[in-house]
């Protein structure tokens, strides 16, 4: 257990009291798995005491759970910049703590990380990313979590080809989850804007204008005329810039498909729409990494600590 001096120095850094929330069993399990893996690479007595506390926490121990998560929140908050830069030697607060009314249990994460080999360091980074993502998700609405799930599943695919099962699973969830469509569209647009920004796209590009156009659609009163006007506006956006229209591929099958009774894209929208190479969108999505997903908490738009390799 920490000395009083150590406890006091740590406690002065607490920015706000811990707000109790119900036990998130997924997050608790992730922290326990993290501790179990760290136990393999360290025999430090302080860590063993901390690990013992973690092992004893379950879904019935709400106060203990919140103290545990509060320690991780503080660790991430104080070390955000260093972790984002992968600078594990420059942590402001090297300890992960579990605070009680009478003192604090903690272990030196920095020492544990630096003294292990590179393979174990990669495992530790994966744990940190996973725990941080779960902590960030606690205050997200279901629509945001659904969009995050889509991007995460796309990121985890080796090649972003059509995956019928993935599409069916995601659409089934969409049908059964009773999402707010307006919130879902805005969450998707926000995620797309974030992704493009992190990939170096200019905010003046046609794609950003496209996102803004879709984001402002009145979903609650969306008529067929609104749909036609939206498609026409999107075509105009890409016509003005000379960029490829990303709607060509999906709309060509809707209005074409060899059926001569269906209107053509050219007759419906009198704007030039150069064909989009098959690999453009896929190549962009392949660049998605943990580092390029941003934090939605507060005004900071970054949250990950280590890019996927």
UniProtKB/Swiss-Prot annotation:
A Pfam family it matches: DUF5891
Name of this protein: Uncharacterized protein 054L
């Amino acid at each position: 257990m920490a000395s009083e001096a150590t406890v006091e120095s740590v406690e002065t850094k607490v920015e706000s009291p811990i707000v109790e929330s119900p036990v998130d069993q997924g997050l608790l399990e992730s922290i326990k798995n993290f501790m179990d893996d760290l136990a393999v690479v360290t025999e430090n007595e302080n860590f063993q005491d901390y690990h013992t506390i973690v092992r004893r926490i379950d879904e019935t121990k709400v106060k203990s759970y919140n103290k545990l998560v509060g320690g991780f929140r503080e660790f991430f908050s104080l070390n955000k910049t260093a972790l984002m830069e992968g600078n594990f030697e420059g942590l402001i607060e090297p300890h992960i703590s579990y605070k009680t009314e009478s003192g604090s249990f903690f272990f030196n994460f920095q020492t544990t990380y630096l003294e292990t080999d590179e393979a174990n360091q990669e495992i530790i980074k994966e744990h940190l990313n996973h725990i941080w993502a779960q902590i960030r998700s606690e205050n997200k609405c279901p629509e945001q979590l659904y969009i995050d799930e889509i991007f995460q599943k796309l990121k985890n695919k080796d090649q972003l080809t059509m995956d019928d099962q993935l599409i069916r699973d995601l659409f089934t969830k969409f049908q059964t989850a009773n999402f707010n469509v307006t919130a879902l569209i805005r969450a998707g647009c926000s995620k797309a804007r974030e992704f493009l920004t992190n990939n170096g796209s200019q905010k003046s590009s046609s794609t950003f204008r496209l996102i803004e156009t879709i984001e402002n659609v009145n979903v609650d009163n969306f008529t067929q005329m609104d749909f036609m006007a939206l498609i026409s506006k999107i075509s105009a956006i890409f016509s003005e810039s000379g960029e490829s229209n990303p709607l060509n591929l999906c709309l060509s099958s809707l209005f074409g498909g060899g059926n001569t009774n269906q209107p053509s894209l050219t007759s419906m929208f009198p704007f030039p729409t150069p064909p989009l190479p098959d690999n453009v969108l896929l190549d962009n999505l392949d660049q998605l990494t943990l580092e390029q997903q941003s934090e939605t908490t507060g005004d900071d738009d970054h949250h990950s600590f280590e890019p996927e390799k």
